Amino acid sequence: GAVGAANNLGGILGPAIGGLLAGITLLTPLWVASGLALVTALFVIFFLPDSPTATKAPETKSKNLSYFDPRILPFIIVGALMFMGMALVQQTLAFRFQDVLGLTAVETAQTFGLAMGCSAAASLASQIGLMQRFDLSPFHWLRIAMPILILAFACLALADNQYLLLVAMVLQGAGMGLAGPAFMSGASMAVEAHEQGAVAGVAGSCGPLGFTIGPLLGGFFYQIQPDLPYWFTFAVYLPLFAFVLSKTPKKKTQS
């Protein structure tokens, strides 16, 4: 909701402002980010209200969820591979822009910042324009998002000009704007109310897992051939899309 929109708004403004600041020096965005972190910390200390005291509910034994729980396993598979692919691509995107367009370091920061802003704007637009207007199940949203992401990776692999790179970034942002919330809400809806804390931990670990493996693979593949990370991710997402198509969304039973 509002928190997700705020995150996407930051994703739009941050790269755009960072690209402008990089025109001063490449270290300027880092100094400004440090200053913003300090301002945020002061705001939290002096202005953020205390959380209301929760009424004590009857204690229920917390249930540990396994990654292999059949209710959430499909979402765990999708989440881990999805975030691995995204991390693999994001690790090499700035190099891709620099190599394809023949840019200097400063020009790369400015151009890539603009592209990241466009990607975040597309993510926000897909959430506001689609997810909040149409009531579809998480798997249906994943079925829409996966082809968009597959097309984005193909565009990144084939790109030989700035326009195709920007199109790829917009597609990637729109696809992840649908896939990310669908993955998290799908895992949450698959379990009971008293298991929400456990499933949040399990599902939340898919992102760090993907971003642990993905960058290592991205750098390795990029050294071999610059378009290889994107073709590899393209190849990973094809069976992932087939897997999503093969799953029949199940309605959660109410007790």
Report residues per predicted region.
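Helix-loop-helix hairpin linking two adjacent transmembrane segments in secondary transporters
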Residues: 6-45
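Symmetry-related core transmembrane helices of the 12-TM Major Facilitator Superfamily/SLC fold
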Residues: 29-46, 229-246
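Juxtamembrane intracellular "pre-TM" segments in multi-pass secondary transporters
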Residues: 49-77
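Short amphipathic helix-loop junctions that connect adjacent transmembrane helices
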Residues: 91-110
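Helix-to-loop junctions at the C-terminal end of transmembrane segments
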Residues: 125-138, 222
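Structural signature of the two symmetry-related core transmembrane helices
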Residues: 140-155
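Intracellular juxtamembrane helix-capping segments at the cytosolic ends
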Residues: 178-191
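A late C-terminal transmembrane helix in Major Facilitator Superfamily
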Residues: 194-223
